[in-house]
A protein has these predicted regions:
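Hydrophobic faces of well-ordered beta-strands that scaffold small-molecule active sites
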Residues: 125-129, 162-165, 185-188, 234-236, ...
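Structured mid-domain segments that build the active-site/substrate or prosthetic-cofactor binding neighborhood
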Residues: 156, 161-166, 314-316, 322-438
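Gly/Pro-rich turn-and-neighbor structural signature
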Residues: 36, 109, 168-169, 174-175, ...
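Contiguous, structured surface segment used for ligand recognition
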Residues: 1-119
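The substrate-binding groove and active-site-proximal loops of carbohydrate-active enzymes
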Residues: 67-70, 130-145, 158-166, 199-217, ...
Length: 438
């Protein structure tokens, strides 16, 4: 028997998890965008707890109800957004690509409709909202939080579960909103533990650990205390203020041995601080720029339980980034004998004071991105992907592309591109538009 979702549809949820409640309100909004007033009965959407794998869901029709089964918060959130996309036709980047909605009386569903999700190819999947110059002073509907809410919603619709919610001050302001929507929090590699930056708190002091160790300790403990009730993957590390090698701020460290020794010592200390408060905490550290070189050369030792995050060069190639005139282009993926958990920090947007594309598309072809990410997966780097999404709007195509990679482990480039264009721009000029992306 055929059913329909319309303005009379009710969403029934007997629990009160905040991320699920927010997703329910968003789907109600989607129904209002898609459906006009109607006197016809709409099927109810019912959320039921069921023993399933983490983040997974199943949708079935049952007696004029559309039932979502899941065992956890994100399972229900993903299930709700699946209905929004698959039945209502609301796309992941509906806000960012100005999707046009033509209202109808209802969205019809076969009585045989069923869908079962499958595990993602990558465990932790998310975005770093970085150099967000087009977002952080923008108001939508007179609400300063609304652009950020739209970022986090798009990420969830793409199957994300992790976010660095902004740069510097913004990361502190918006992490509670991100958590309320169901996302785990992690941190920029220049802001270990999500703590306030030393130069921000003490602008009159030289940011030297040797001179002010207690001040650094206090900042790290403050970061832990402010986030210990959230679901966090704690980033450990030690970079200079403003995202540079720490020895730029403290020139007494002139050898690789001394630099690696200090970084390893402080990473261990930060881990101990977190462990004292949260015994089952998860950790990560970025092997980025100078850090990767120290690690590769054996000068930096890391705890076994820390996810090692490898990085591209800022423009999609998995080699070390340039810093000034230093550009070694060392391959940035783990060797076969490098055990433990691994992740990547990958850029669809990059701003390094020498070159930038944070307000334009990535100046590379989809096949390069596909090739590099396939290489990442072939090296079994599947524990953690954080994608620098910057302002989101200029980068939606690649964000959608990578979402397919972290879900399925692969993507058909041409099929995805044509589907993306047809979904957002219509069927009339697919060939011409596709050339702009290739």
């Amino acid at each position: 028997m055929e059913m329909q979702i319309n303005v009379n549809t009710k969403i029934i949820y007997m629990d009160s998890a905040v991320p699920v409640m927010r997703a329910i309100e968003n789907v109600k909004r989607d129904i209002r965008k898609v459906c006009c007033d109607s006197d016809e009965k709409g099927c109810d959407i019912v959320l039921i707890m069921e023993n399933m794998q983490a983040e997974q869901f199943e949708i079935k029709c049952d007696n004029n109800m559309l039932v979502i089964y899941a065992s956890d918060t994100l399972g229900f959130v993903y299930g709700l957004y699946h209905i929004s996309r698959d039945i209502l036709g609301v796309l992941p980047f509906w806000f960012w690509n100005d999707q046009v909605f033509i209202k109808k009386k209802g969205c019809r569903i076969s009585g045989e409709y069923a869908y079962t999700s499958k595990p993602y190819a990558v465990k932790y999947r998310g975005w770093f909202v970085n150099d967000e110059v087009l977002i952080h002073k923008w108001y939508v509907d007179r609400k300063k939080d609304m652009p950020w809410e739209m970022v986090f919603e798009a990420l969830l619709r793409c199957g994300g579960n992790l976010v660095i919610p902004g740069t510097d001050k913004n990361s502190h302001i918006y992490r509670d909103l991100a958590a309320d929507m169901g996302l785990r929090i992690t941190h920029h590699h220049a802001e270990p533990l999500g703590a306030p930056m030393f130069a921000r708190r003490y602008p009159e002091l030289t940011p030297s650990y040797d001179e002010y160790p207690e001040k650094f300790h206090e900042l790290w403990k403050e970061g832990i205390d402010e986030q210990k009730k959230l679901d966090v993957i704690w980033n450990l590390g030690f970079r200079g203020q403003g995202d540079c090698p720490f020895w730029d701020n403290d020139p007494r460290y002139q050898t690789s041995e001394s630099r690696g020794e200090l970084m390893g010592k402080l990473i261990g200390l930060q881990r101990d601080y977190v462990q004292n408060e949260i015994p089952d905490a998860q950790y990560c550290t970025n092997l980025y720029g100078e850090t990767m070189e120290l690690y590769r050369d054996g000068y930096l030792k890391l705890p076994d339980d820390v996810i090692k995050i490898w990085a591209d060069n800022g423009f999609g190639k998995m080699v070390t980034r340039r810093q000034g005139n230093h550009n070694p282009r060392i391959p940035a993926l783990p060797k076969e004998n490098n055990t433990g958990r691994h992740g990547i920090y990958y850029h669809v947007s990059f701003y390094d004071l020498q070159a930038a594309n944070h307000i334009t598309m990535l100046p590379n072809k989809p096949k390069l991105v596909h090739s590099e990410l396939k290489k990442v997966l072939e090296h079994h780097v599947k524990d953690y992907w954080i994608i620098n999404c910057s302002n989101v709007k200029p980068h939606v195509y690649y964000l959608d592309f990578i979402a397919n990679m972290w879900r399925d482990g692969d993507v058909d480039i041409d099929k995805h591109l044509k589907g993306y264009i047809a979904s957002y721009y219509g069927e009339d000029h697919i060939t011409e538009i596709a050339e702009c992306f290739r």
